[in-house]
Curated annotation (Swiss-Prot):
GO terms of molecular function: rRNA binding; structural constituent of ribosome
Keywords: Ribonucleoprotein, Ribosomal protein, RNA-binding, rRNA-binding
Matching NCBIfam families: PRK05738.1-3, PRK05738.1-5, PRK05738.2-4
Keyword Nucleotide-binding applies: no
Descriptive protein name: Large ribosomal subunit protein uL23
Species in which this protein is naturally found: Zymomonas mobilis subsp. mobilis (strain ATCC 31821 / ZM4 / CP4)
Length: 103
């Protein structure tokens, strides 16, 4: 298994694609939860392992949601946006991740 310089497996970066910053995800942060965009084939145990390794926090639970892509039109022709999988990660008491830094 390939590891980066800080000891985190490179495959963790393939699981967690980035934070999902919306008004709703900001409201959920009051309940000690963070929302991430994740790979479509990522499982809950893999997401938990990746978040714990990447951010050095303890994860209490992981809930996932698959948002189906909308049908849009471009130059009169219909196309479909990609599906997005989101993970709502609830952290243990006293743990926090600040995803808004650097935005």
């Amino acid at each position: 298994m390939a590891k980066s310089q800080d000891g985190v497996a490179i495959r963790h970066y393939d699981v967690v694609l980035g934070p999902h910053i919306t008004e709703k995800s900001t409201m959920v942060s009051e309940f000690n939860a963070v929302v991430f965009k994740v790979a479509a084939d990522a499982t809950k145990p893999a997401i938990k392992e990746a978040v714990e390794a990447l951010f050095g926090v303890s994860v209490k639970s992981v809930n996932t949601v698959i948002t189906k892509g909308k049908t849009k039109k471009w130059k009169g022709r219909p196309y479909r946006r990609s599906d997005v999988k989101k993970a709502i990660v609830t952290l243990a008491e006293g743990q926090s991740i600040d995803v808004t830094t650097g935005v």
